[in-house]
Amino acid sequence: GKGYDGDLVAPMIRDIGLGLAMGDTSLDVMAANLGKVGSNQNGGWDDAGGRDLHVGAWHVGVLPPTAPLPIASVTMTGLAFAAWHQKLERFQVACIGEGASSSGEFWEAMNLAGARGLPITYILQNNQIALDTSPIKQSGVEVWADKADAMGFPAWTIDGSDPAAWYASTASAREFALNGGGPTLIHVETMRGCGHA
């Protein structure tokens, strides 16, 4: 991937492929992921850089993930607001899990995005378990994409194991946003084989 020049993404800690899609190198992604010397992430022990599973690459628009997952939605909504206010042609992507979609921060972010028509998509990855809570005990909605209805913007569900669906969905969301359509939510149905981390 060459990514999209100027666009910004906020991945979750396991979203290594998103950095590659935006144009980061395999070496940089692995150095950051493993906390090795040469990482483009600051910190670590003895300037080793990075932290396990926390990758980011500012030079290609990939923000470092945050451990509290809902924060990405707020950060990216703020950056989308700045882009909208400055009339920049820039698209923002905030990745969160289904558990994070029950947080107040996420709802506040979506409310602002919907009210202002901000150029952002929220990728809600439903891996069937938030820390240790099953989806049926987290929310009253049966289809997680329905959460966007309350904020007045479109959403759809894709199969998380289908790379073509990922590409087509994010490309559609980007085109929609940059043509003035506003925010979207992409609900990704996937499965994690075990509990947290």
Q: What name fits each language-model region?
A:
Residues 1-116, 134-140, 145-152:
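Cofactor-binding active-site loop characterized by glycine-rich and histidine/acidic residues
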Residues 10, 121-123, 157, 185-187:
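Structured core elements
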Residues 105-106, 125, 195:
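Short, function-defining helix-loop hinge/capping sites that tune catalysis or transport
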